[in-house]
Amino acid sequence: MQKNIRNFSIIAHIDHGKSTLADRLLHLTGALSDREMKEQFLDKMELEREKGITIKLKPVRLNYRARDGQEYILNLIDTPGHVDFSYEVSRSLAACEGALLVVDASQGIEAQTLANVYMAMDLDLEIIGVVNKIDLPGAEPEVVKQEMENVLGLDQDEVLPISAKLGTGVEDVLEAIVERIPPPSGDKEAALKALIFDSYFDPYKGAISYIRVVEGELRQGDMIRMMSSGKEYEVDEIGVLSPYMTEVEVLSSGEVGYVAAGMKNVNDTRVGDTITGARRAAPEALSGYQEVKPMVYCGLYPLENSEFERLRDALDRLKLNDASLFYEPDNSDALGFGFRCGFLGLLHLEIVKERLEREYDLSLLATAPSVIYRVLLTDGSELMVQNPTHWPPPQKIDRVMEPYVKASIMVPNDYVGTIMELCQEKRGSFITMEYLTSHRVVINYRLPLAEILYDFFDALKSRTRGYASLDYEFHGFDTSDLIKLDIMLNGEVVDALSFIVHEDKAYYRARAIVNKLRKIIPRQMYEVAIQAAIGNRILARENIKAMRKDVLAKCYGGDITRKKKLLEKQKEGKKRMKQIGRVEVPKDAFMTVLDIEND
């Protein structure tokens, strides 16, 4: 049985046809009928279909009768292709013995694909090269095969040319999986060891874990233990996904399936944890797993303060499905109660926000995203600051360190100059440049993470007409000249608009934000002063003129002293209003801090 199992995943850049190939494999092996066949079957979230990307991994079991007449079980463990989700990719790959590397015949290898292939090579997976979209007019399968050999060392004669859309050559892919990917090793008789590579919450069954059994076997009614927490549960149901949930009696070593054990809390089924038997435990857990650290932080606040509890509940549920989401309650003078959340990257942030709004019907406001800074104080202590409102006063700061990333940018060589210019603007330092082919280059730069956050990706695409691709990895902390810029309305600091900026860019950003706010904040009954300040030093100021009621409308001609009296009275009223009045800041003003870069 075990020798006929093949566990594999698909590595591909966004839009290189991974989900289409997965659909085609489901169809060919009979897992889906013609009627059920719909685009991106494994991407269950509406959002995934809309954006055309894979966010959550869904494992699926395919039964395939090979040309040698034997029946094989193929477990496809789908992986997301976006750089934010590289930890999910690593978990997926750890559950496999092989991977299909899918590359678009008209685009060639992209930067993120490279990063994921290296991850698969580190895990010793068998890699099968596939060139997809050979039916396109601009396809150059031979050039791409040559590139795969030069860059990754795959034998170009073994790379399979296919068109997932038309189904050409997909049968050969299934044969290659059977022939070239090794069956799982692992002793069926040993103590149970199963790897959790994903989990989600079911309102009826509680937390459900997707697992790959590495050793031993798991049966219904068994008592299991989570190795990280030591908690024990009784197994209510186990099964496989083919592609719908199907109960089975036993899952043994090498198999992929799901387990429901009545866990009420998703934190009990941690992604990357090892499940073992409670009565006969494995001596040590499976290696290679770490707690994911968020890289990008932002505040999420409900538009109605009464929605705070609903937001908490929604975040608790999302956390169930998303091990990398971090959040803690936060309070802002301007925005009321909300949460400070941590994400893997900007796409992750956008997806979480959209899911909260769609699936839980919440109206949310997100503050400008920021990274985590390491602040060394004059008394020798150290602070990790991820919220600008917690920034210490300048006189207490010795130096500030910010996170850096190593970015690999792949571009056609016509655009090398513009890319280097962009990286210099973003405070980058050049590392290396290498030619993959005569017209494709990989440029490596070291950049501050904060500079990548805003619109680096958009600028990259627009300067290279969409040809560049980007991959980045965390590369330690480094000292920078950073300061906190406060925005004040009538002398009061609006905490939600504060942000951290590099000294060289402070004046430019201050000027731009003050101008933008002047256009967005509606006129009040009294004059409003908008100021940008660093400590006590004002960098920029704009005034919004007061709305003025014509108090002289009733005076026809007549006595000037009467008019003066009315005008003085109005002036007094405005003065009093200014003392007690609060400026209403429209919600979209908080995103202006973000949009400045684009103007």
From Swiss-Prot:
Catalytic activity annotated for this protein?
A: GTP + H2O = GDP + phosphate + H(+)
Matches recorded under PROSITE patterns: G_TR_1 (PS00301), G_TR_2 (PS51722)
Q: What class of enzyme is it?
A: hydrolase
How does the UniProt record describe the way this protein sits in the membrane?
Answer: Peripheral membrane protein
GO BP of this protein: positive regulation of translation
Any idea where this protein resides?
Cell membrane
Which stretches make up the tr-type G domain?
3-185
What PANTHER family would the database entry show? TRANSLATION FACTOR GUF1 HOMOLOG, CHLOROPLASTIC, TRANSLATION FACTOR GUF1-RELATED
This chain belongs to the protein called Elongation factor 4
Q: Which gene encodes it?
A: lepA
